Amino acid sequence: MKRLLLLGGIGEALALARRLGPAHLYSLAGLGKVPGDLACRVRVGGYGGAEGLAAFIDEQGFDLLVDATHPYAARISQNAVRAARLAGVPCWALRRPGWQAGPGDDWREVADWRELIAALAPFRRPLFTLGREPLEHLGQVPPHQHWTGRCLQGQPAAPRAEVIGARGPFSLDGERALFERLACDVLVSKNSGSQATEPKLQVAREMGLPVLVLARPALPPADREFADGEALLAAIRDWESA
């Protein structure tokens, strides 16, 4: 029986895992809730880099590695491609396209945190929706700014900064209420992409707020790449039956 290792981290990965049988393994880094209703096995934790992942693939006898991690998890994707090559198995990847700005959107892409800090200079109350990443930069908050960040787990208050613990998905009304309560004047976001644009981007459009978009990292090419989960699942079904 063929066996695959699915590296998860986004909603589409969980949707795939729900449709996998007990021969397969769904792997999570450890952030967030672990689903308890899956037919496939679940593993939580890292592997110690590409070499460790390759050894795990070889020891467990997996025939296929599927990378369905977040588009900004560049290191994991790099390790996945390298590990598959070391283990001698194919690596398939879910590479969902990014969101596209539409009428009324004011999106401004920045390449890295240096550009982001510079682009934030005219604003006073930015809202960061970058996960835990802003926590590493709280020492850079200028005197005229107050930062609010949102991630899975809240953090103790810092000078001129607040970190809210919240788990999505978020409703449109909830995002409107949050933006109004915070009186934010700019949104900082990743271009994560998905089938639907997130409510926070719609609220920014409604309120006429600019969105500073942290550019996607370059990802290594996989043996096969898929733009959506359904196409990936269809390929897995074909692979299982071949």
Question: PLM features: what roles do these ranges have?
Answer:
Residues R160-V186, N191-M207, L212-R216:
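A C-terminal functional module that forms or caps the active site or interfaces directly
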Residues Y26-G48, D105, A158-V163:
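N-terminal beta-loop-helix "entrance" segment that forms/cooperates
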Residues R114-H146:
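Internal active-site segments that recognize and position negatively charged phosphoryl groups
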Residues C40-I57, I164-G174:
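Glycine-rich, highly charged phosphate/nucleotide-binding loops
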Residues A54-W113:
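Glycine/small-residue-rich loop that forms an oxyanion/phosphate-binding "nest" at active or ligand-binding sites
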Residues V42-G46, D106-R114, R224-L232:
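Short acidic-hydrophobic, aromatic-tinged amphipathic segments that line or gate anion-handling sites
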Residues L4-L31:
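N-terminal basic/disordered segments at the start of proteins
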Residues G139-P169:
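Histidine/lysine/aspartate-rich catalytic loop segments that bind and position anionic ligands
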